[in-house]
From Swiss-Prot:
Gene behind this protein: PNMA2
Protein known as: Paraneoplastic antigen Ma2 homolog
Listed Acidic residues bias regions: 335-351
InterPro entries: PNMA, PNMA_C, PNMA_N
Recorded GO CC terms: nucleolus
Keyword annotations of the record: Acetylation, Nucleus
Phylogenetic placement of the source organism: Eukaryota, Metazoa, Chordata, Craniata, Vertebrata
Family statement drawn from the similarity comment of this UniProt entry: Belongs to the PNMA family.
Region (Disordered) residue spans: 335-364
Xref: Pfam families: PNMA, PNMA_N
């Protein structure tokens, strides 16, 4: 266990494990200067510290470093994670009077919920239980509070649960679990809007889904502009990994897309919509006339029945072209009508005058 490693390491070096931190997950190629640069910024609220040593952890394929805090630490301001080279570095520390195994399990549970122990106390609003007082709280009291969280999760905790993004690497040969870039981008664009946290946290969550060249690009754009927004990061991904067809190409591709032989009109409209949205994104077609352009292209590029053509012509003459869903509703209704009419004709009995046995009885 990580905390046990911290205790053993401190015991070997004869330092106080209550005034020490262990940072894990540091890439092997990260120099000491790079490590110091990250730690100095993140651990500034803790005052002076001393770097005691570094070890390689084979199971993580990463390094860990041990720090000695030279001033009495304020546990409530110690971060559990820091953003470093190659991704997230975990910070391991020991609090006074804590039960090692219990608190490790508690932290693991809260980590899955997107929470911390101090954040849990703030959310529950316990009288007299501030984050600064947390080191002196007994495991029994922590267990009681955890039971409250499980039985009655407070509202401030719930929004912190967030939908995670699928993995994306941008590699030439993607992993089996990866989505195509366009699918991943569409998902990411929608999900990041739901994350109820600050931009810095959104960028950290976004980075958790990135691997390989995609992660490298994220580091580059953040280095160029530390205040860059998540939306701007996704725009950078679109420029590097997306389809780079020109405005003119996307416009021509849309206008020259026609209904194929044997293809239903509704299927054609659905296929056309993907191209239209791409053209709008490229600003090849103004967004405010997209409904009008869609209707005109369907009337020009599809083989329509006389009834459907008249209905669409009527919609066009009204001056308020239908939205995509409204247009699909009209087309699907007409397709259902045509299918019903064809079925009725198919089911009519064979015979000369079409009256069936009723007509035969009348002639008797």
């Amino acid at each position: 266990m990580a905390l046990a490693l911290l205790e053993d390491w401190c015991r070997i070096l004869s330092v106080d494990d209550q005034k020490s931190l262990m940072v894990m997950g540091i890439p092997v190629d990260c120099s000491e200067d790079e490590i110091q640069e990250v730690l100095q910024e993140i651990l500034k609220p803790l005052g002076r510290y001393k770097l005691l040593g570094k070890i390689f952890r084979k199971q993580e394929n990463a390094n860990a470093v041990l720090l000695e805090l030279l001033e009495d630490p304020e546990v409530s301001v110690i971060p559990s994670k820091v953003q470093g080279k190659g991704g997230i570095w975990k910070v391991i520390f020991k609090t006074p009077n804590q039960d090692t195994e219990f608190l490790e399990r508690l932290n693991l549970f809260l980590e899955k919920e997107g929470q911390t122990v101090s954040g849990m106390f703030r959310a529950l609003g316990h009288q007299g239980l501030s984050p600064a007082a947390m080191p002196c709280i007994s495991p029994e009291l922590l267990a009681h509070v955890l039971g409250q969280v499980i039985a009655h999760p407070p509202q401030p905790l719930l929004p912190m649960r967030y939908r995670k993004l699928r993995v994306f690497s941008g590699s030439a040969v993607p992993a089996p679990e990866e989505e195509p870039f366009e699918v991943w981008l569409e998902q990411a664009t929608e999900i990041v809007k739901e994350w109820p946290v600050a931009e810095a946290e959104k960028k950290r969550w976004l980075m958790e889904s990135l691997r390989g060249p995609a992660l490298d690009l994220m580091h580059i754009v953040q280095a160029d502009n530390p205040s860059i927004s998540v939306e701007e990061c996704l725009e950078a991904f679109k420029q590097v990994f997306g389809n780079l067809e020109s405005r003119r190409t996307s416009q021509v591709k849309y206008l020259k897309t026609y209904q194929e032989e044997g293809e239903k009109v509704s299927a054609y409209v659905l296929r056309l919509e993907t191209l239209l949205r791409r053209a709008v994104e490229k600003r090849a077609i103004p967004r405010n006339i997209a409904d009008q352009i869609r209707l005109e292209q369907v009337m020009a590029g599809a083989s329509l029945s006389e009834v459907l053509w008249c209905r669409l012509r009527e919609l066009k003459d009204q001056g308020r072209p239908p939205s995509f869903l409204q247009l699909m509703k009209v087309i699907r209704e007409e397709e259902e009508e045509e299918a019903t009419f064809e079925n009725e004709n198919t089911e009519e009995p064979e015979g000369g005058d079409g009256y069936g046995h009723w007509g035969n009885e009348a002639n008797d």
